[in-house]
């Protein structure tokens, strides 16, 4: 799981920013959504002591796992003071995340009743939670600790009543007689804590010791006079040792303090880190693709990656085909960086050896460029919407309709690609300028075609000659010496120009037969694919 580096804009009202912390599992992204009314209504009723208590237990557990010994009283007291003095914004952010988890675990039909009963607008009624796989009360982690979980009813009592319960105190909880489903009810007003005789007995002496400490040291209490140690033995009062660092009066005082006095959190937008799971679908997070070309190719790649990273969604432009004659997306194809990966490693740039296309051909460039990056499907009547088992590449959604700058690095063609091997063997310099050429089998039959963006769609190459046909070298004009093109095939004033005015545009391609060893000896001047 990765955290988003950017923060989405939100709304502010009543002088406080209302946000909830959201995480979408399918899209694997974090974002911030407007504060949910469930969290906004319950946040003022959460006790601030809950933040201190949960974090104190986590610190003690972490210290014990690291040092293999318990935290000393001085260290524990320092941690307690640090947590009590934490900023209200931090406490409210934590409470918002925890309330979001609780909302998820409460059945939808009981969420409104839960809010109304906690806020005092309705008499207490049962609020059922979603059971676990065994039909029992669910357990959640309150501080993103996978190894430390708390029962939902324990969390409710700590949050809304401020009772310092341990995670193992689930057996001490007692449901009210009015509760109709004690096994799954998480209504705080239906949950009580059982007090045993030992608790009552200890409460008296601990409270007496605490009250005696609050008095003036110069005036010792009567209990201190009676319980003076004799002959070095401990007094009766000293046999009760408190394991915590809270005194009785301090514990009662901090457990009654609300975490938020207002109707919403008051933390700033820049402090937000993450969110809970709410209400935004992955489709709502998608960025709409621009209709015109952008100046930054990085933004285009980022938007394409966002489209590819959301599984289980339909492509953006499914069923919205464009005719080759529509020139709304003709601009922008030449702005793609030449170093970007493409399925057949063919690079297209403005520095190509081809002449500039005529205005009549410009309308089909955007369509032809996008069609070039689609996977080639073999077969006489193959459909572009074939099953993934036919294509031999990952099943992530592929945008198949025309666009100005799509490049899918995840698509891989079959390693035994006849055209690729042929271009690398015969025409290494023209591998970047391959026109509309069919995939050739050993018997010369064509199985698929790669569209050339520099030619309109109606111009198709002639069928390949029979297997015994040999390539015919083209005549060269005697007036100009042959020179090789520079800058990746860029046209120069001294480059040779071949013209065949008597032939039609469809016959201006060199037709080649099956692979033959004699192809290696083809002269240099026959390596130009476009002859017009």
Curated annotation (Swiss-Prot):
It comes from the Eukaryota. Residues 455-480 have a biased composition (Pro residues). The modification Phosphoserine is found at residues 281, 288, 303, 310, 323, 328, 342, 383, 492. The keyword Transcription applies. It is found in: Nucleus. Residues 386-399, 521-532 have a biased composition (Polar residues). The keyword Transmembrane does not apply. A motif (9aaTAD) lies at residues 417-425. One of its GO terms (cellular component) is nucleus. Keywords: Activator, DNA replication, DNA-binding, Methylation, Nucleus, Phosphoprotein, Transcription, Transcription regulation. GO terms for biological process: BMP signaling pathway; cartilage development; cell morphogenesis; DNA replication; exit from mitosis; gene expression; generation of neurons; glial cell fate specification. Its main location: nucleus. Residues 24-217 bind DNA. Residues 212-234, 282-407, 441-532 are annotated as: Disordered. SMART domains: DWA. One of its GO terms (molecular function) is chromatin binding. Recognizes and binds the palindromic sequence 5'-TTGGCNNNNNGCCAA-3' present in viral and cellular promoters and in the origin of replication of adenovirus type 2. These proteins are individually capable of activating transcription and replication. The 9aaTAD motif is a transactivation domain present in a large number of yeast and animal transcription factors. Binds DNA as a homodimer. This is Nuclear factor 1 A-type. It comes from Mus musculus (Mouse). The gene is Nfia.
């Amino acid at each position: 799981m990765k955290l988003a580096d950017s923060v989405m804009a939100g709304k502010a009202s009543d002088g406080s920013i209302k946000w909830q912390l959201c995480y979408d599992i399918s899209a694997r992204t974090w974002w911030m959504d407007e504060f949910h009314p469930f969290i906004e209504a319950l946040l003022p009723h959460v006790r601030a002591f809950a933040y201190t208590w949960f974090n104190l237990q986590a610190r003690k557990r972490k210290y014990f796992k690291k040092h293999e010994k318990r935290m000393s009283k001085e260290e524990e007291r320092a941690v307690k003071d640090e947590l009590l003095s934490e900023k209200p914004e931090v406490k409210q952010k934590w409470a918002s995340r925890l309330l979001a988890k609780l909302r998820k675990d409460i059945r939808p039909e009981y969420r409104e009743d839960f809010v109304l009963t906690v806020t005092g607008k309705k008499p207490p009624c049962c609020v059922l939670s979603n059971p676990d796989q065994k039909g029992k009360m669910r357990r959640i982690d309150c501080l993103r600790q996978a190894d430390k979980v708390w029962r939902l009813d324990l969390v409710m009592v700590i949050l809304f009543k401020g009772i310092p319960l341990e995670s193992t105190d689930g057996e001490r909880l007692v449901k009210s007689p009015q509760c109709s489903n004690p096994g799954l009810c998480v209504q705080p007003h239906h949950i009580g804590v059982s007090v045993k005789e030992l608790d009552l007995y200890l409460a008296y002496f601990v409270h007496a010791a605490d009250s005696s400490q609050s008095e003036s040291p110069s005036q010792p209490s009567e209990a201190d006079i009676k319980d003076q140690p004799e002959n070095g033995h401990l007094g009766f009062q000293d046999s009760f040792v408190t394991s915590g660092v809270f005194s009785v009066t301090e514990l009662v005082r901090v457990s009654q303090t609300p975490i938020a006095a207002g109707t919403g959190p008051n933390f700033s937008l820049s402090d937000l880190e993450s969110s809970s799971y709410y209400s935004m679908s992955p489709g709502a997070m998608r960025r709409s693709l621009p209709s015109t070309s952008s100046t930054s190719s990085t933004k285009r790649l980022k938007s394409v990656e966002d489209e590819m990273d959301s599984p289980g969604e339909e492509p953006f432009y499914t069923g919205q085909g464009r005719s080759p004659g529509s020139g709304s997306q003709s601009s922008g194809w030449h702005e793609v960086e030449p170093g970007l990966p493409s399925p057949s490693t063919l690079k297209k740039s403005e520095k190509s050896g081809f002449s500039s296309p005529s205005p009549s051909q410009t309308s089909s460039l955007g369509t032809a460029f996008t069609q070039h990056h689609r996977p080639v499907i073999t077969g006489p009547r193959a459909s572009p919407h074939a099953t993934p088992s036919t294509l031999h590449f990952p099943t992530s959604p592929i945008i198949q309709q025309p666009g100005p700058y799509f490049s899918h690095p995840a698509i891989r063609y079959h390693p035994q690609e006849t055209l690729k091997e042929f271009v690398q063997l015969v025409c290494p310099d023209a591998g970047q300028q391959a026109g509309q050429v069919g995939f050739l089998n050993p018997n010369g039959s064509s199985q698929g075609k790669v569209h050339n963006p520099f030619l309109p769609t109606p111009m198709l190459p002639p069928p390949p000659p029979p297997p015994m046909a040999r390539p015919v070298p083209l005549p060269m004009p005697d007036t100009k010496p042959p020179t090789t093109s520079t800058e990746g095939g860029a046209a120069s004033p001294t480059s040779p120009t071949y013209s065949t005015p008597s032939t039609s545009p469809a016959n201006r391609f060199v037709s080649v037969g099956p692979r033959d060893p004699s192809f290696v000896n083809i002269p240099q001047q026959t390596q130009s694919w476009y002859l017009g």
